[in-house]
Regions:
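Conserved residues at the C-terminal ends of beta-strands
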Residues: 27, 49, 235, 240, ...
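Short acidic/polar active-site loop segments enriched in Thr and Asp
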Residues: 22, 230, 423
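Active-site-proximal helices and loops of the catalytic beta/alpha 8
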Residues: 63-71, 81-82, 123, 127, ...
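Surface-exposed cleft-lining segments at the edges of enzyme active sites
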Residues: 395-401
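Substrate-binding/active-site clefts of carbohydrate-active enzymes
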Residues: 1-12, 18-22, 28-227, 248-260, ...
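Extracellular and analogous surface-interaction loops
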Residues: 13-14, 526
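A generic structural-conservation signal
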Residues: 25, 76, 233, 425-426
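Active-site neighborhood of divalent metal-dependent phosphoester/pyrophosphate hydrolases
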Residues: 388-395
Length: 603
């Protein structure tokens, strides 16, 4: 995340494919401006790929093309909520007060009118790639709106330096125009201001209800759609009103993909939002406007034509409606043993990260029961993006990478790969990389000591994937990484998931089933003639009643059971292990039998 480049990723696509993954979610690629970092969350030029990520023969376009050549997809993290503290090039960039006196000459670089910041090129006068000479002025700029320009604040820095008004970007100083940026700090994370104020001083909050801002962002992300990315992860989605997503940004994505690649491509362009509700419950402290599932739905009434007014009207209306009056759906659920065509008519166009499962992944059983408790409130929970930890947090908003142990990781994976939703893994978890390490500690410690450390050393060597989950050759350190117990577990889980359509796309039910983490899944598609029905239990035993009679074969062991009375009992396979009994329906829907070879957990 904070090191490496596209060339390294291109070179290791076979490692990712060899684990069995078919898609890669990468952090933002836009030109970042924030001293040393280039993670893209401090976007400065949204129309330019950060050159620190590119090299000869390894542009962003090269990465997209290379992934597609291997049958893999690229999901790009994108940000509509904010820019860097230095604004957004082409929209607005603030000018701060600066003075190259005895105290501050080290900080303020001399202006070089012939130099343009790109994050990579070293500016010759300062000797810095993070040159800031274009960002400050001692003379008050024309049209300045920052209050008290250049006057002493009466405060000093920790070093004892005099601090001046307008010396750094701030939402409340008047430095940012109200038309383009919000001018306040968030005071209540479950209040209206969480959608219309700054999160952090490094994240200048766009006025996303302004047409100029909307057009700037839509134009920028059209560029990456044109390059062929396969989907977007929407960062900080909760901090933008749902009306703005539903009116402007989500339709713009669909319109552009359709225009460039056709309606089928638009239907398959996967969009998922980060609605960061850090609670263990179904709704975020009772606030529907701040809950993940809320963003998967279209609006259910008309609001003012003006986007800013509409955002407030929608907020008030939905808060008054409360949690009990929100729409519900059975799109994720079987009707008895039958799959039914999902009703997509009320879908907003945004799927979401499953924050409730993420928060409750202290153990798999807890995540499972909390997850299914929320599923009727999503438009379609089978599209939820499910993970244990990420570049931001571990379960229960832990500041550390998951440290539950190898057996617990195996159990978590067995659940994620067979339950509804799209299983997602943060890099390195296949070897419990940096377990227990603090994910982020800002500039106070080396990145190598954090959960965001560089993983490339574990991938040194050569690897060739013959198919998803299949490695034909590996040498060097990467061979050791692939031999790790959880890496092998992942490979087989991915093999099984790919071979059983019900696990990939099916609806589920726990009706008539006894067992802690046990469920049945089915997917049917008349056009292709697909019908896939599977009984799943994770770690513990289960009894299934009221199921179709017939022959069932376990994809893990190859064991076959004939059901004649609608009941099947499965003994407990053990922690992290799994049973997937697939109904043999003959022909193209025949049970695949045992898939893969026994490993440390699936046996």
């Amino acid at each position: 995340m904070f090191r490496g480049d596209f060339k390294g990723l291109v070179q290791k696509l076979d490692y990712i494919k060899g684990l069995g993954f078919s898609a890669i979610w990468i952090t933002p690629v836009v030109l970042n401006r924030s001293d040393y970092d280039y993670h893209g969350y401090h976007g400065y030029d949204f129309y330019k790929v950060d050159p620190r990520l590119e090299s000869a023969g390894a542009s962003y376009q090269d990465l997209i093309n290379a992934a597609h050549a291997k049958g893999m997809k690229i999901y790009q993290d994108v940000i509509h909520n904010h820019s860097s503290r230095w604004g957004a090039k082409g929209l607005f960039t603030p000018k701060t007060y600066g003075v190259r006196d005895a105290q501050w000459s080290w900080y303020y670089d001399e202006r070089n009118d012939g130099f343009e910041y790109d994050g990579l090129t070293v500016e010759p006068k300062s000797g810095k790639s993070y040159y800031n000479g274009d960002l400050w002025s001692t003379a008050e700029p024309t049209g300045n709106t920052c209050v008290g320009w250049g006057t002493p604040t009466g405060h000093t820095s920790p070093e004892g330096y005099r601090i001046y008004n307008c010396q750094w970007p701030s939402p409340t100083s008047g430095m940012f125009p109200k038309a383009l940026y919000h001018n306040c700090w968030i005071g209540n994370w479950e209040g209206e201001d969480s959608r219309s104020c700054w999160i952090h001083d490094d994240l200048a909050d766009f006025n996303t209800e302004n047409a100029q801002v909307q057009n700037y962002l839509i134009g920028a992300y059209n560029k990456y759609i044109d390059m062929g990315v396969d989907g977007f992860r929407l960062d900080t989605a909760v901090h933008i009103p749902r009306t703005t997503w539903n009116r402007r940004f989500l339709p713009a994505i669909q319109e552009r993909v359709t225009q460039r690649f056709g309606a089928e491509a638009a239907a398959n362009f996967f969009v998922f939002g980060e609605v960061a509700a850090f609670v263990n419950d179904k709704w975020n402290r009772g606030s529907v406007n701040h809950s993940a599932q809320f963003f998967t739905w279209k609006e259910r009434k008309e609001y003012s034509a003006d986007d800013e007014k509409a955002a407030l009207e929608m907020y008030d209306y939905e808060q008054q409606q409360g949690t009990a009056a929100q729409p519900v759906s059975d799109n994720a659920f079987l009707r008895g043993n039958a799959y039914h065509t999902p009703d997509r008519s009320r879908f907003s166009g945004m799927n979401v990260i499953d924050m409730r499962m993420h928060m409750n992944f202290g153990d798999a059983n807890n995540a499972f029961h909390n997850g299914k408790d929320s599923d009727d409130s999503y438009h379609d929970a089978t599209y939820n993006v499910v993970y244990v930890d990420s570049h931001d947090y571990g379960p229960n908003k832990s500041s550390e990478r998951y440290t539950g142990g190898t057996d617990a990781w195996a159990e978590n994976m067995s659940l994620m790969w067979t339950f509804r939703g799209i299983p997602t893994l943060y890099y390195g978890s296949e070897i419990e990389f940096q377990k227990g390490k603090k994910i982020d500690c800002g500039p106070t410690c080396p990145l190598a000591s954090t959960g965001r450390a560089y993983f490339g050393d574990h991938l040194a060597g050569e690897v060739t994937a013959s198919d998803f989950g299949k490695v034909s050759s590996a040498s060097g350190k990467v061979a050791d990484t692939l031999a790790a117990p959880l890496a092998r577990h992942l490979q087989r889980l991915n093999e099984i998931r790919r071979a059983v359509p019900a696990l990939q796309m099916g609806q589920y039910s726990t009706e008539g089933i006894s067992g802690s983490m046990a469920y049945k899944r089915r997917y049917t598609d008349a056009a292709s003639g697909t019908d896939s029905f599977a009984l799943v239990t994770v770690s513990g035993g289960a009894t299934y009643t009221g199921i179709p009679n017939g022959t069932y074969t376990d994809a893990v062991t190859g064991d076959t059971k004939v059901v004649s009375g609608g009941t099947l009992t499965v003994p407990a396979p053990g922690k992290g292990n799994l049973r997937v009994y697939v109904l043999d329906l003959g022909g193209k829907n025949a049970a695949p039998g045992k898939i893969g070879t026994a490993g440390p957990y699936l046996k």
